[in-house]
Amino acid sequence: MEAVHNTPMMKQYFSIKADYPDAFLFYRLGDFYELFFEDAKQVAHELELTLTAKNGKNAEHPIPMCGVPHHAANGYIEQLIERGYKVALCDQVEDPKLTKGLVKREVVQVITPGTLMSSLTEKENRYLVAVVEQDGRFGIARGDVSTGESALTSVATLDAVAKELSIILPREIVVTSSEHEAALSHLQIPLTQSTRRETHPHGDRAIDAAQADAFAVLYAYMHDTQKRSLAHLQPAIVYEAADFMQLEPNTVKNLELVRSARTGDKKGSLLGLLDVTGTAMGGRMLKRWLEKPLLSQHTIAERLDAVEELLAHYFERQQLKDTLREVYDLERLVAKVGYGTASARDLVQLKSTLRLIPRIQAALEELFSDRLGQLALGLDPHDELTDLLDRAFVEAPPISTKDGGMIRTGFDPALDELLVASKDGKTWLATLEASERQATGIKTLKIGYNRVFGYYIEVSRANAKLLPEGRYERKQTLANAERYVTPELKEKEALILGAEEKSITLEYELFCQVRDQVKTHIESLQRVSRRIAELDVLVALAETAERHDYVRPVTLTGRNVMIENGRHPVIETVLPRGEYVANGINLNEDREMLLITGPNMSGKSTYMRQFALIALLHQIGSFVPASRAELPIFDQIFTRIGAADDLVSGQSTFMVEMVETQEALTRATDRSLILLDEIGRGTSTYDGMALAQAIVEHIAEHVGAKTLFSTHYHELTVLEDSMPRLANVHVRAVEQDGRVVFLHEVRDGKADQSYGIHVARLADLPDALIARAEVLLSEFEQTEERTVVSPKEPVVQAEPVDQLSLFAETDPVRETVQTLDLINMTPLEALNTLYRLQAEARK
C-alpha cells in the first residue's frame, strides 16, 4: 500500500469510517466534504460528480475521491437520503487555527431517511418507526425528529404491523431481527437493523412490554444518529386499535383519503379538499385525524359542537383564519430549539407566533363550545419569554448565528461597547479612504478586506506609480491592481478586528444563553402548538362546511343510517355548481344490505364511496355533504372497489379481490361498513356469480354489517325475495335516440338492463364492431338463461369453455395429454392417440 494510505489524515479517515460501514462518510476538509474509495465511486455515480484521485490518477494505487462544498452539502445529502441511503457527517470539532498537527474530527450526525431535518414537506410528518416483538406481541413506536411527536401501539401479528405501517407511511423502519426485516420488505420502505435500547420517559399511560421495548429501540436509534439532546421528544401518545375506526390500507387508497388514486397527489383527495388550514401543524393534525377517525361519541360531539359554533360566528372565524395564517410552524420551531439547531431567525418567528395568542384568545371569548373553551385556556402567551426574545434580537436577524448582527442594542452593555468600537473603526476607515484619495489624487483608490491579508489599500496598476515612495508597503499584486498597507492602517486593523471578533464571539454566546432559556419552556410551548393546531383544524372544517353547504350529522347509538341528498365531497367540487346529482341512503334493522345494479359509468362506485366518506367525515367530527344525516358509529370500513393487479406480489385482479373480500368477511362486525364493488368480475361468469351470491349470503347470515354490494350480475337481484334484510337499488339510466343517458339517480328496485354496448359506443368503438356486438347479444339472450338458486340450495352449473374455473373438476383428457411421452412416440402412435383423445373430448 502506498504511503499516502498511512498518512495521519487517512488513518483518521479509516478509523472513523469503520464505525459507519452502512453510511456514506462526508469527511470535512477545509471548505469541502470529501468522500473516498467506494463511497466516492458510488456517490459520484448517484450525484453525477467528477471522480478524481487524492494521490493522482497515475499513482500505483489511486484513492478515488469526490467532494461537495460544505455550504451546499444539504442539497446533495437530501438527494442521497431520498434514494434510501444514509450519510455520516464528519466535521472538524476543533479550531484549525488553534491546533498543531491533525485537526480532530468526529461524526456529528448520521442522516437517514427517517431523521432528515432539512427539505421537509410543510404539512407532512416524517416518521421513523421501530418494530419489536416481545411477549407474543409486536410493539410499534413512531417518532418525528422534526416535530418531537411520538406514539406507541402494539398488535398481534406481523400482518397487522404491515397494515399499521401502510397507514403511517414512515420514511424508515428499524427492526431488531432479519426475520422481521424480510417480513416487512414488501412495504418498500428503507429498513435498518438495530438492537440497542435506551430508555426514555414515555408519558403517564401504562404500556405493555412490546411497546416499551419498541420505544427504547426507537429512542436509542434517534440518539445514536442525531448525537445530541432530544429534549423536544414529547411524551408518547399510547393508543390501541380499538381506540379508533380501523381502516385497511386499501380502504385509505380506494376512498382517496390523503392521495388521489390517479395522480398520487394530495390534490383530488379528501385531505386536499378539507385542508384549508392556515398553519403547518394544523395541516399535519388534519391528516392524522383522517387516518384515525374516532369511536368516542363524546369526542365526536365535542368537535361537532366546536365546528357548529365557529360556523355560526362568521366574524370571529374570519379573525381566527387571518391570525392563524400569520402563525409560524411552532411545532418544528420548538423542536429545533430542543434539537439545538434553532437560529436567531427561528426564535424571532417563535416570538412573533406567541404575540398572536392574545388575538386568538380575544376571538375565542365570543365562542362557548366546551372544546373551544378548553383550547382557549391552554393558550399561554408566555409573556416573560416573549419579552426576553423581543429585547434580545433585532427584528430581521441574519440566517447565520456565527457572523453577528443578531443581538439588539441595549441587551448587553459589554457587547454594545464592542460594537461601538467596531463601528468607530469602520468610520475611521471611511475617513482614511477619503483622505488617501485626496492626498494621492487617485479617485479609484479604495480600502478593502479579506481574511488572508486583512485591510488593504487597493489602486489600479496604472495608478500605482502615483503613490509616494516610502509610506506604502506592497502586500499583494493582482492582474490589474496592487494592494498596499500603511503603518496607520496596520495599527488600526488590530483594534478593529479585535473588536469585531470579540463582538461576534460574544453575540453567539448571548444567543446560546437565550436559546437555552427558551429550551426550559419546551413542554409548555408544545402544548400551545397542539392547541393552535387543533383550533386550526376545527376552523378549517367550519370553513369547508360553509363553502360547500354541509350539515351537522346526528350521531345515533343504534345501527340505523339515514342520509338525505348525500354528495361525494370531492367529486361535487370538480363539477359546475349544482350539477352533482345528490342521492340518499336508508339502512335499518330490516334493510342492512343494498344490492346495487346499473350500467357501467352510471355512478355505482361513486355512490358507495360517497356513503363511506360521509361516515368517515362524521367520525372525525366534521359536518357532512348532505341535507340531512343520521349516522351510527362504525368500528371499521372495508372496501373492495376498482380493479387492480398487485404486480409486486404477483397477484391478479381476481386474487386481490378475494384477499380484500376475505379481510372484510373475517374481521368485520355488525358495527362495520362494507363496500364491495363488482365482486367476481375477475373470473368466469358462473364462478363469479356463484361467489358473489355466496358472499352476499355470508355477510347477511354471519357478519350483519351494513353493506353496499354493487354487481353486474343482474340475476342476483332475485335474492331480495328470499333475503329479508337485502334490498335492491339501481342507478337510473335512460335510452334516448339509441344512446344511453346516465341520470346518476339511485332508486329502489333493480336495473332493467346493463347498457354495456351503449357504453362501448360512448367510447367510440368502431360502428361495425358495435353492430356485431348487438347481433351477438341478441343471440346470447335467446340461447342462454342464467339463474340464481335460493340461498343454501345446491348449485348445479355448466362451466363455459372460454375460461377455466378456479374450482373445475379434474379433466381426464387434460391429464392424458400431460402424461404423453412425445419424444419417444412414433408418428403412427401419435395419430392413434390424437384420435382417441378427440373421441373422448366429444363425449
From Swiss-Prot:
Membrane-spanning residues: none
Protein name: DNA mismatch repair protein MutS
GO biological process: mismatch repair
Key words, A-Z: ATP-binding, DNA damage, DNA repair, DNA-binding, Nucleotide-binding
The keyword DNA repair belongs to this UniProt entry's keyword annotation: yes
Family: Belongs to the DNA mismatch repair MutS family.
Binding sites annotated in the UniProt record for ATP: G598, P599, N600, M601, S602, G603, K604, S605
GO molecular function: ATP binding; ATP-dependent DNA damage sensor activity; damaged DNA binding; mismatched DNA binding
Source organism (scientific name): Exiguobacterium sibiricum (strain DSM 17290 / CCUG 55495 / CIP 109462 / JCM 13490 / 255-15)
The keyword ATP-binding is assigned to this record: yes
Record's function text: This protein is involved in the repair of mismatches in DNA. It is possible that it carries out the mismatch recognition step. This protein has a weak ATPase activity.
PROSITE patterns recorded: DNA_MISMATCH_REPAIR_2
SUPFAM superfamilies from the UniProt entry: DNA repair protein MutS, domain I (SSF55271), DNA repair protein MutS, domain II (SSF53150), DNA repair protein MutS, domain III (SSF48334), P-loop containing nucleoside triphosphate hydrolases (SSF52540)
Listed GO CC annotations: cytosol
Pfam families, per database record: MutS_I (PF01624), MutS_II (PF05188), MutS_III (PF05192), MutS_IV (PF05190), MutS_V (PF00488)
Gene name as annotated: mutS
